[in-house]
């Protein structure tokens, strides 16, 4: 019986490349010349620092653009609501969603069951295992998960026939 896992994870190497490209773009941008701004990556958290709140939002846009160029889904970003002000700099922390939370996994399983496809889905930790009789059913589940608006990107692995 064909089966697959639906997971939500960020490629660490591509994320680091996107951050390094963002730093490179930050150094060459005209509107950041003479300003104190930085982008740092440490322990799966990106820290954006700038002299005012507007520039912090520009740094978020730069990071989003570089992530999409490196094929890392920007929907996995979890940006702080408000910039933290300390001294003369504002800083934002950007965290990345790893794994599927239980609530989102339950919604995904319910959506799969409501689609009337002949598959069984079960929650296994931070992933969802889907098994079915035909490969076509699993591909339909993949399309359904990609179209879903659950606020988190999904990847598919352990595809077994």
UniProtKB/Swiss-Prot annotation:
One of its GO terms (cellular component) is cytosol. CDD domains: YajQ_like. It comes from the Bacteria. Keywords: Nucleotide-binding. One of its GO terms (molecular function) is nucleotide binding. InterPro entries: DUF520 (IPR007551), UPF0234-like_C (IPR035571), UPF0234_N (IPR035570), YajQ-like_sf (IPR036183). Pfam families: DUF520. Nucleotide-binding protein. HAMAP family: YajQ. Belongs to the YajQ family. NCBIfam families: PRK05412.1 (NF003819). This is Nucleotide-binding protein Ssed_3443. It comes from Shewanella sediminis (strain HAW-EB3).
């Amino acid at each position: 019986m064909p089966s697959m896992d639906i997971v939500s994870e960020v490629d660490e190497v591509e994320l680091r490349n996107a951050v390094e490209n963002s730093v490179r773009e930050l150094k060459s941008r005209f509107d950041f010349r003479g300003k104190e701004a930085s982008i740092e990556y440490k322990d799966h958290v990106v820290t954006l620092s700038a002299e005012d709140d507007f520039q912090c939002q520009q740094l978020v846009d730069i990071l989003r653009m570089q992530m999409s160029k490196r094929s890392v889904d920007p929907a996995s970003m979890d940006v702080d609501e408000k910039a933290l002000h300390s001294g003369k700099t504002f800083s934002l922390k950007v965290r990345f969603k790893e794994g599927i939370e239980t609530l989102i996994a339950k919604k995904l399983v319910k959506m799969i069951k409501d689609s009337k496809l002949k598959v069984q889905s079960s929650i296994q930790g931070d992933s969802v295992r889907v098994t079915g009789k035909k490969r076509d059913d699993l591909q339909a589940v993949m399309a359904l998960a990609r179209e879903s608006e659950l606020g988190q990107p999904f990847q598919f692995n352990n595809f077994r026939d």
